[in-house]
């Protein structure tokens, strides 16, 4: 049995969780401040929706930079502290990683759009016919395999992620 088989997961959207700056937007520091409460609730794993740099046109799933924290939410140092504080309480972290799409602001998208024959050209599917692939299902109602956990060994990384 894996640790996540009977774990209690708690999902938090950082931007709407707890504001620590007075700007009306939740922050990673706000999440840190509530960890004792989450531990008291019996949470084993905190699940964070995307908090990466994004224009926020799709609730943060439109990621512009996978290596940066959205500036309204905090810094990479705040994220590192969150991971350390979770682990100090015996809790784990799961994040959403939207690898199958990016923001239109992402450098790869911009490069592909500018030069579809260039090195990033095949990172995206370009076409003018919306009915070109009518048989493709966008939502897979018969499977939940997309909600998998990938386990990591590094303390600096997430304990798992949802792809």
Task: Set out the residue ranges of the language-model regions.
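Acidic/aromatic-lined carbohydrate-recognition and catalytic surfaces
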Residues: 2-154
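Single conserved hydrophobic/aromatic residue that forms the stacking wall/gate
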Residues: 152-163
């Amino acid at each position: 049995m894996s640790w996540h088989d009977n774990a209690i997961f708690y999902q938090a959207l950082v931007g709407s969780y707890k504001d620590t700056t007075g700007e009306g937007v939740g922050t990673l520091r706000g999440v840190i401040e509530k960890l004792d409460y989450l531990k008291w609730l019996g949470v084993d794993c905190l699940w964070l929706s995307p908090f990466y740099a994004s224009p926020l046109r799709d609730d943060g799933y439109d990621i512009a930079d996978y290596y940066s924290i959205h500036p309204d939410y905090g810094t990479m140092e705040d994220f590192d502290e969150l991971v350390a504080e979770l682990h100090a309480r015996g809790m784990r972290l799961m994040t959403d990683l939207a690898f199958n799409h990016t923001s239109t602001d992402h450098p790869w998208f911009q490069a592909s759009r500018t030069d579809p024959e260039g090195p990033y050209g095949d990172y995206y599917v370009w076409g003018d016919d919306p009915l070109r692939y009518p048989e493709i299902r966008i939502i897979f109602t018969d499977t939940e395999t997309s909600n998998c956990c990938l386990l990591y060994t590094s303390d600096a990384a997430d304990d798992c992620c949802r792809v």
